[in-house]
Amino acid sequence: MTVGKSSKMLQHIDYRMRCILQDGRIFIGTFKAFDKHMNLILCDCDEFRKIKPKNSKQAEREEKRVLGLVLLRGENLVSMTVEGPPPKDTGIARVPLAGAAGGPGIGRAAGRGIPAGVPMPQAPAGLAGPVRGVGGPSQQVMTPQGRGTVAAAAAAATASIAGAPTQYPPGRGGPPPPMGRGAPPPGMMGPPPGMRPPMGPPMGIPPGRGTPMGMPPPGMRPPPPGMRGPPPPGLRPPRP
């Protein structure tokens, strides 16, 4: 359908139209759309029909029904007439135009989080968390490091939590070696891995002379007062 032939129909868009059907019903609604088969779309439509009385003495009565949005088939349409002008609010844009002046309100997104410039709220006294650096690893240990220092950082964190001795700064050497547990002399094999080395003689006693008189060997409890301890190695106990 060309626009020239339907220009008269386009001029009646948004008008209140009265449509009469073949069965005598009347539809009055706002004319919104049509096609080449004269199928119509009416909104806010009302139906009016005449009901014949059972008794010939009574007059015909008209019944009204509110239908709303209606799709009317063109094959049932007999005539269309203008019932009234378009509503006044038809030309009002539902969406604000680009150059239209705005009102007093300001459209903005819903607030999420804390806006910039607002001071952070402080916890009440007694409810705050531990002070930074107390109750956990130090700030130096928690600082991100390279891949090669992950193991060193983990060891330092374990030592700081377990209360190990103070760490020595790099370049000044480590802690002194323990006394009495040096490397084995040349020509002798050390203890296998996982075993403690044998206890050496106490400091101040030359090797090879055993324990002094009156002192029990390592690992034995001293005798009670008034009793003599066991004889040193290499000496026989006196006969009674």
From Swiss-Prot:
InterPro entries the UniProt entry points to: LSM_dom_sf, Sm, Sm_dom_euk/arc, snRNP-assoc_SmB/SmN
Pro residues compositional bias, start-end: 172-205, 214-240
Keywords attached to this entry: Cytoplasm, Methylation, mRNA processing, mRNA splicing, Nucleus, Repeat, Ribonucleoprotein, RNA-binding, Spliceosome
Localization terms from the record: Cytoplasm, Cytosol; Nucleus
Keyword check for Cytoplasm: yes
Domain Sm residues, every copy: 4-86
GO CC entries: cytosol; methylosome; nuclear speck; nucleus; SMN-Sm protein complex; U1 snRNP; U2-type catalytic step 2 spliceosome; U2-type precatalytic spliceosome
Residue windows of the Sequence repeats: 175-181, 191-196, 216-221, 222-228, 230-236
PTM characteristics: Methylated by PRMT5. Arg-108 and Arg-112 are dimethylated, probably to asymmetric dimethylarginine.
Modified residues (Omega-N-methylarginine): 108, 112, 147, 172
Region (Disordered): 163-240
Gene Ontology biological process: mRNA splicing, via spliceosome; spliceosomal snRNP assembly
Annotated region (Repeat-rich region), positions in chain: 175-236
Dimethylated arginine modification, residue list: 108, 112
Family: Belongs to the snRNP SmB/SmN family.
Oligomeric and partner information: Core component of the spliceosomal U1, U2, U4 and U5 small nuclear ribonucleoproteins (snRNPs), the building blocks of the spliceosome. Most spliceosomal snRNPs contain a common set of Sm proteins, SNRPB, SNRPD1, SNRPD2, SNRPD3, SNRPE, SNRPF and SNRPG that assemble in a heptameric protein ring on the Sm site of the small nuclear RNA to form the core snRNP. Component of the U1 snRNP. The U1 snRNP is composed of the U1 snRNA and the 7 core Sm proteins SNRPB, SNRPD1, SNRPD2, SNRPD3, SNRPE, SNRPF and SNRPG, and at least three U1 snRNP-specific proteins SNRNP70/U1-70K, SNRPA/U1-A and SNRPC/U1-C.
PANTHER family: SNRPN UPSTREAM READING FRAME PROTEIN, SNURF (PTHR14508), SNRPN UPSTREAM READING FRAME PROTEIN-RELATED (PTHR14508:SF2)
The protein's name in its UniProt record: Small nuclear ribonucleoprotein-associated protein B'
Native organism: Erinaceus europaeus
Gene: SNRPB
